[in-house]
């Protein structure tokens, strides 16, 4: 069994493997590329040059739910990007968080999307952020 690699050390091969596993989860069938596999790896390599790995991982989850192909994903990446202010926290909570962390994240999203957050809302946002950052260490 290969040793699990931390996401910050992911290469294009790791991202392709993650794409394939997420595609199976969401589409109930394996991803079959219509192109030579090296082009898919090149697509992920190009994305890694411009985006944070956690931003890419979040976008992969969105794209595989819709059954997108990798070349379309790369060409229209902005359509799949969640534009999260904290992509690392969001991905870690969604991937590894327990019910408590997930509820905190949903509360964070709820408060952060309010048009006119009160002072207590902003304070609660910083408390949630601190707690999740402490958990993510």
Q: What residue spans do the PLM features occupy?
A:
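Short, cationic/aromatic linear interface patches
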Residues: 43-131
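Intrinsically disordered, low-complexity segments enriched in glycine/proline and serine/threonine
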Residues: 25, 130-134
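Long, charged low-complexity interaction segments
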Residues: 1-50, 54
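Short intrinsically disordered terminal tails
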Residues: 1, 133-137
